[in-house]
Amino acid sequence: MLGFNDIIGHEEIIRHLKNAIQTEKVSHSYIFTGDPGSGKKLLAGTYAMTLQCEEGGTEPCGHCDSCKKAIGKNHPDIIMVTHEKPNVITIDEIREQIINDVDIKPYCSPYKIYIVANAELMNPQAQNALLKTIEEPPEYAVIMLLTSNIDALLPTIRSRCVRLDLKVVDDGLVKKYLMEHLHIPDYQAEIDASYAHGSIGRAKQVATSQEFADMTQNALRILKNADGMEVYELTEAIKELSNDKQNMSDYLDLFQFWFRDVLMFKATREVDNLVFKQEINYIREQASQRSYENLEKILDALEKTKVRLRANVNTELALELLFLTIREK
């Protein structure tokens, strides 16, 4: 597990957590909230390891017995709450793993830490049961709730926890991370970082996915050749995309990046800020052939297509309407 100094972004939260350690003002309950892949589990895990570290600093040493156990995920005083069913955390699971356990003092550490990932899955009964422990915790107890949907937590839970909101990470930092840690080439890292929308976790996922790489190449093939495609070729492309419903949202994101690049290049003639800068010859050509009005219409049509698909409109029909707009000049 990394230390705080190795985490990308989230500087304010890290400062807050380090200050809590330094001033010995560690809260008994925290909510880490942010989009999936934003780093909630990494931050909470690093905080837990630091709190239990035998060196007692604001960074985990990584070498003491406590840190080794945390890294090996077998620390007796860092409890990851589990649940049997995929879509719910029940009152019995909260009782068994937290409520009935919390009065037992730590085995070998200053704190006893409970981490509840996907805390929004706790049903109301489970949350109400946990509330009493949050209100009257033993002095050594720390409960960390991780959620991508804080509104699913009861107001009484939210009001009694320190709330830490994870913000999106700057695309430049995400790209740098992918290039330095995963050795992703510059061009591909640019695409992956843009697509990840500020999520390091999502960026790592797409950067190592052959499926995403193939999808990107397929999207580029369509985008570069859409203007010159015969009707039958366009029909085949639409059918191919409409059959890949699982990745449809990803395709539409890639289409948006492309036409934003065309619009940006048309307006600025600059290449450095483009996502698909390696395709500059095609982008330059489309920028010269399309008007600002046409590009705005295409970007608007892409947003409307996303709305239609969320409303379960026929996929093939929604794509036909989109490609009609793309084919206009």
Feature names for model-found ranges:
Residues 100, 132, 155, 159:
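Conserved adenine-binding aromatic site and its adjacent loop/helix in ATP-hydrolyzing domains
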